[in-house]
Amino acid sequence: MRMEYTSSQFFTIFTAIVFGSIQAGNVFNFVPDISNASNAGTSMFALLDQKPQIDIQSNEGTVLHECQGHVQFENVGFEYPTRPGAPVLRGINMDIPPGSYCALVGSSGCGKSTTIQLMERFYDVSSGRILLDGHDIRTLNLASLRKHIALVSQEPTLYDGTIEFNLRLGALENPDDVTETQLKEAARSANILDFIEGLPEGFRTQVGSKGTQLSGGQKQRLAIARALIRNPKILLLDEATSALDSDSEKIVQKALDAAATGRTTIAIAHRLATIAHADCIFAFHQGVISEAGNHQTLLQQNGIYANLVTLQALEKH
């Protein structure tokens, strides 16, 4: 059957074909972008599907119900996975008795912070082993290990919310289970309870984004209180007072000394006056421990530690 079209119909069809061809041509301009987006999506999902070598959600490993806080490093060596062949730590040996105060000192980049990261199992050692109460920490359940350890770093992280909200985050499991008594006890140990109770809203006071409503010393003492919420047996201090002015440092240092009581404490210190009372001081140099002893012993050796003390004394003048 032969069909006939009017000129109007012909023009409509012709116009549709022309404009359709133009739009189809425009689509091809986006082909490179579509290809790039597809490749990026593939890479992103491959990354999301990766399982960490150290999985905090894993149920594997021995659960350490009770912890004395005896820490031992046995011939520990470490190099970062991204820098193979460049050892950061070599042959590290430390025996830190329960309840003792130990300090790590040395120049920047000598391996002090890496030592603390290994203790928390952010990484696993490349050689040797780290023991907690005689257990290789790699054999312990990770959540169980971190339950007994708390870290106070140089730059405390506070979240937009109340003081109470930020303190409850220190609980390893359910923050809602933290009692008011526990909150007050942690704040008292961190030497900040009087300050909190003097505020109109008390523990419900808003701290602002990143704690902008608080001073540096107040933020640091809140971080100490948060670390104590879980009542850890091991306290790690990574230059916890180095970013503070001298007045705030004295207040925070008093809080740290109180928090360290009855706990195994490993402190990284830039200002050596804050760790002169330590039971043992380990002086790091280029990834190895070059000296170990108390303040007086190391001064008499007239080595790296004595040199650091002299330099800081000169800086004050």
Predicted regions and their residues:
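An intracellular "coupling" helix at the cytosolic face of ABC transporter transmembrane type-1 domains
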Residues: 1-4, 22, 26-36, 53, ...
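Membrane-water interface of transmembrane alpha-helices in multipass transporters/channels
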Residues: 3-15
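Cytosolic ends of transmembrane helices, especially the final helix of ABC transmembrane type-1 domains
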Residues: 13, 17-47
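Amphipathic, soluble alpha-helical interaction motifs
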Residues: 23, 30, 47-50, 278, ...
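Conserved E/DxxT/N motif and adjacent residues on the DHp alpha2 helix
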Residues: 46, 53, 168
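Pre-NBD coupling/linker segments of ABC/ABC-like ATPases
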Residues: 53-66
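ABC-type nucleotide-binding domain
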Residues: 64-317
